[in-house]
A protein has these predicted regions:
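N-terminal non-catalytic cap/leader segment that marks the start of a structured domain
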Residues: 1-95, 264
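Short catalytic-site patches enriched in acidic/histidine residues
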Residues: 96-114, 135-136, 177-184, 244-248
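Structural signature of FAD isoalloxazine-binding scaffolds in flavoprotein oxidoreductases
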Residues: 91-108, 123, 258-269
Length: 280
């Protein structure tokens, strides 16, 4: 299933794409796509429902984030060896873990803010994992039992704040609008091979990133198992899994976003985002 949220910010309705590509209002079955409802039981009920009988939502309305109010937004850094190389970093022997503030989450086509004085705003197309039930101290072979689905993420990063301001990466990763997710939460049964999905990102119509999830250093099962050793994961938690090469920081000379720039990104079977950078 492809689940999404449609409507003005703060008033989104949960929906699902039916077999004809129409968006059906599922609010009679689930109040919202939040941690209270993002679980395997809810998905099972929706899969058995007669979607064609549900009201249709307008495809021209704003698409919100595919999840609202997740408990955690966990991120994995330098998870593609060629991306690590372009940043001058060593290939990690274990997953590099950091957090993004959940308040940074916005819809897939919402504006991305650039604040006064920001000089190194960067892009990162990434695969997001959505957890479907409590996950604690599990093996890699158990990981798929805990994964509800996947989504497209743009891990927007202000590199000066991330690297030059001292401390952890979270400062450069967490400003409002630095976490566009969606358009869809795609349940895992719709993905034939999560470890072989094409991904790309364009800035102002120019291709910047081209990659495939097959080149991740740590695949989704490893990541979920690894994180579960250090923190419990709950239904609705998002894990974004790292980016392929082609970020602005890795270019020579470096290139960063400015007000008026546009980003278009996609991952195979997970949909597409279109964002504009606006001055705050």
């Amino acid at each position: 299933m492809k689940l999404l949220r449609v409507g003005n910010k703060g008033n989104e309705k949960p929906g699902v794409l039916d077999k004809d590509g129409k968006i059906r209002d599922i609010s009679s079955h689930v109040k919202d796509l939040n941690p209270d409802h993002l679980n395997f039981e809810t998905i099972s009920k929706l899969q058995s429902a007669d979607l064609s009988s549900l009201p249709e939502l307008s495809a021209s309305d704003r698409i919100g984030s595919c999840i609202t109010k997740p408990g955690k937004f966990v991120a994995i850094g330098l998870n593609y060896s060629d991306h690590a190389a372009e940043t001058g970093a060593d290939v990690p022997s274990e997953p590099i873990v950091f957090m993004k503030a959940t308040s940074c989450i916005v819809g897939p086509n919402d504006d991305v803010e650039i604040v006064s004085g920001s000089k190194k705003l960067d892009w990162e197309v990434e695969l997001g994992i959505i957890i479907g039930k409590e996950t604690k101290h599990i093996s890699e072979s158990q990981a798929q039992d805990h994964i509800l689905g996947y989504c497209l993420v743009n891990d927007i990063s202000e590199r000066e704040w991330q690297i030059e301001k001292m401390g952890q990466w979270v400062k450069g990763k967490s400003h409002d609008t630095y976490g566009p997710i969606g358009p869809y939460l795609v349940t895992k049964d719709e993905i034939a091979d999560i470890n072989n999905l094409k991904m790309n990102l364009d800035v102002n119509g120019k291709r910047m990133q081209t990659g495939n999830t097959s080149t991740m250093i740590f695949n989704v099962d490893i990541i979920v198992s690894y994180l579960s050793k250090f923190m419990s994961l709950q239904a609705g938690d998002i894990i974004t899994t790292g980016t392929p090469p082609g970020v602005g920081m890795g270019m020579k000379p470096q290139q960063f976003l400015k007000a008026g720039d546009t980003m278009k990104l996609s991952i195979e079977n997970l949909g597409e985002q279109n964002s504009k950078v606006v001055a705050l």
